[in-house]
Amino acid sequence: MAQSTEDNTRRPRPSDLPEMFRPPVNRAMRVLDRSFFKKTVPLSAATIFKNSDISRVRRALEQSKDILALPRLNTIQDIKQDDVVKKCLLLKETIRHDDTATWSPTINELVDNGVVGVGPFDLTLDYDYWLHSDIISAVLPEELLEEVPQGFTQVGHVAQLNLREQFIPWRHLIAQVLLDKNPTLRTVIRKTEDVGSQSEFRTFPYELLAGDSDMNVIQHEQDCEFRFDFSRVYWNSRLHTEHQRLVDLFKPGEMVCDVMAGVGPFAIPAGKKKIFVWANDLNPHGYEVMQDAVKRNKVFKFVTPFNQDGRSFIRWSARALQKYDPVTVTIQPRTKRTRDASGQVKETQPPLEVYTRPKVFHHYVMNLPGNALEFLDAFIGVYAGCEELFEPHTKEQLPMVHVYCFSGHSENEVDDHIDICKRMSERLEYPITVEDRVGGAGNTELELSIHNVRLVSPNKQMFCASFRLPRAVAFRKK
């Protein structure tokens, strides 16, 4: 089942229910017993004698704040009196049917006028009522309640839990409750080792915690659909805003080289924006998925997948693009329909859109944060002998390079930026410093920016460094 994951990292808010409405506690539970979570709460209710009065009584009691205010609970309930089922409104827990001193003037007036009667009502709450956080808080030891695990990353129907060591004994219980409380989920897994620890394809070993073992997912992002086996490719739903941020930098008709494209989270949306992309990935399954995504999302005129090593692809693609036959894509925009002042429909046919694939790349994307910086030396001499393709001989500038990387997490990020610049300089054999950033006093031709993508862990930050490939690097003769 296809599902959009616009909010991919779900963090249910812990319940702030009053004590009497919280679930029963069993801190010895290790295997989920749903039947244990059942509770009867004695309340009072205002029984409405005529159904025609339900709406006005409800409005009156809402205004007087006498109605029970519990999330996810219908305050209108059935109540049986003398074998006749009537409607009643649940009253807040401080109101007692046998103590008129707890009644508000509104309740007194409704009773005096014979509109309602106030009596006892036993409210039954069960497992289905409470949130994931309510149930988990009722089974974990008290010393762990400050950090109840609630967040997860969703990819299609699969939830990926990242649990700290102290929660491992309850992992299956936590996962089963998560599955029960989220109808779009069918599978819950836990990563047992870091991404890429056992595979060069950035996959990870995992443990199935709850649900079925099917890892073939359907994922939507930026109006594109991807279908893949999550156990065989890399996908991080937390990066959806970063994918969009970068794609928004590309202009229709530009040429992009996506060096480590994965299943295409940059390439496929870019193709939909009429941007030409050569998208490469080393993972054979990722390549197959990307081929499917190209067809499925109808971007085959703009996106071409490849299955090569990233380092060799950087050098090969720059030369191959010059030799390939020109590609021209003609698109007929949809007819525009408008109404004039008299109401008549007027049709306007926009002119044809014509895009010709460029002979040089405008952007390189290197989304392999673990070691993408190590590939930068492939740009040394990448356009050696091809100076005539760029300024001042043509209007084309050298490409922007967008390289993802990890660095330590410093308080003001200055140390991180210095570290990233140092590592880029070493691989490019060209000096890059933090002063070269846009707005700085350094080399303005670099157009350097370092974007903070996300905090991966307390001591690990993900960044995207963007810079224009220096002439001294691109044209260097080895």
UniProtKB/Swiss-Prot annotation:
InterPro entries: MeTrfase_TRM5/TYW2, SAM-dependent_MTases_sf, TRM5-TYW2-like_MTfase, TRM5/TYW2-like_N, tRNA_Gua_MeTrfase_euk. It comes from the Eukaryota. One of its GO terms (biological process) is mitochondrial tRNA methylation. Its main location: mitochondrion. Keywords: Cytoplasm, Methyltransferase, Mitochondrion, Nucleus, S-adenosyl-L-methionine, Transferase, tRNA processing. Belongs to the class I-like SAM-binding methyltransferase superfamily. TRM5/TYW2 family. It catalyses: guanosine(37) in tRNA + S-adenosyl-L-methionine = N(1)-methylguanosine(37) in tRNA + S-adenosyl-L-homocysteine + H(+). Specifically methylates the N1 position of guanosine-37 in various cytoplasmic and mitochondrial tRNAs. Methylation is not dependent on the nature of the nucleoside 5' of the target nucleoside. This is the first step in the biosynthesis of wybutosine (yW), a modified base adjacent to the anticodon of tRNAs and required for accurate decoding. It comes from Emericella nidulans (strain FGSC A4 / ATCC 38163 / CBS 112.46 / NRRL 194 / M139). Disulfide bonds: none annotated. One of its GO terms (cellular component) is cytoplasm. This is tRNA (guanine(37)-N(1))-methyltransferase. S-adenosyl-L-methionine binds at residues 243, 281-282, 309-310, 367. It is an enzyme of class 2 (transferase). Residues 7-16 have a biased composition (Basic and acidic residues). Its EC number is 2.1.1.228. Residues 1-22 are annotated as: Disordered. It is found in: Mitochondrion matrix; Nucleus; Cytoplasm. Monomer. GO terms for molecular function: tRNA (guanine(37)-N1)-methyltransferase activity; tRNA methyltransferase activity.
